[in-house]
Structure formats: C-alpha cells, structure tokens
Regions:
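Gly/Ser/Thr-rich loops at beta-strand to alpha-helix junctions
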Residues: 1, 26-29, 117-124
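Short acidic, glycine/serine/threonine-rich loops at helix termini
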Residues: 33-34, 84, 125-130
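Anion-binding (especially nucleotide phosphate/pyrophosphate-binding) glycine-rich loop
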Residues: 56-121
Length: 169
C-alpha cells in the first residue's frame, strides 16, 4: 500500500484533480496477508507455531469471514528472515508451522485457504505442513522420516490415520 500511496501522491502533483484508487497488491511473500485482509475486509489473527528451525514463532494470518477463507504467508511461519544466515540450510528447515496455522484457521471455521509461498526458508515439499495436519510420512521400516528435506528421499508410505477430521469436509 505504501508504494501505491507514493504513486498517488506523485500523480496528484501533476494533476490534482486525477482520480487515483490505491489497491493492495502482493506477490505471495511478506505483505500478502496485509494486502488481502485490507482488500477483502478481513481481520488478522496471531498464533504461536513451530518456526522453520523448530523454535516457537508468532505468525500473523488473515481471515475473510464472508468466505470462511484464511490468508496465510509461508514467510510468517517458515520464513527465510526467521533463520540466521549461518543456519540457512533447507535440509533442516520445516513447514510444520504452516500446517499449525492452517489447523488454527480450521478451528476458527475456515474451509478455504490462500497460502502465499514467497519468502520461505524451506524445501520440504510441504511434508512438515501435512505432518502438522496429521499425515504420517514413513520410511521402508514404517518409521517416521526425518523432518525437513532430509527425509524426503526416504518416504515410502503416507498414512492419514491421524488426519484432523475437518479435512474430510
């Protein structure tokens, strides 16, 4: 919105009578929640989730009540800015917190989801997110694979025995 207001100000310097409408815009990374909540008359929520390195983080997301839609940024729960430079290794980062945000939104009545994937620190293919929702990713011995991208090569089975019931709706 900031860039839009700056552009509007510049246009008005040239033509004070020009009608300029500033609308939210985002690329799927940081700022997506803010833009869509503002543009769709939503509200913001905050939830404590598992960050990309397993530490707790507070993630902001949006809810558009009229459509029961949650607006989530991966960057808020699994963002690159949450990982210090010396620990930036996608083999060890997880999207688990994104699944926790989705679960929180489901508990608040959301059934549709917009997930912006920009700004992510992860490359686990969404496995962590699905684990948070109750899916199990098993290796050839029936054991849970390692978290993050490290375990991807070992997945031989996916089970849904513990998936939250709302996902069947």
């Amino acid at each position: 919105m900031e860039a839009g207001f700056a552009a509007a100000e510049g246009i008005h310097r040239v033509d004070a009578e020009a009608e300029v409408l500033v609308r939210p815009l985002a690329d799927g990374g940081e700022g997506t929640v803010e833009a869509l909540v503002a543009g769709m008359n939503g509200k913001t929520e905050h939830v404590k989730v598992t960050g990309p390195l397993g530490e707790p983080v507070i993630c902001e997301y949006g809810i558009i009540e009229s459509t029961k839609t949650a607006v989530i940024e991966m960057a808020g729960a699994a963002g690159i800015t949450q990982v210090p430079d010396e620990k930036r290794n996608p083999l060890y980062t997880t999207t688990y917190g994104v699944g926790e945000v989705i679960k929180d939104a489901i508990e608040k009545g959301c059934r549709r989801f917009i997930v912006g994937i920009g700004g992510s620190a992860t490359n686990d293919g969404g496995v962590g997110m699905l684990q948070a929702l109750g899916y199990a990713f098993l290796d050839k011995d029936g054991k849970q694979v390692l978290p993050g991208a490290r375990g991807l090569k070992d997945i031989t089975e996916i089970t849904d025995a513990y998936v939250i019931p709302e996902l069947a709706e």
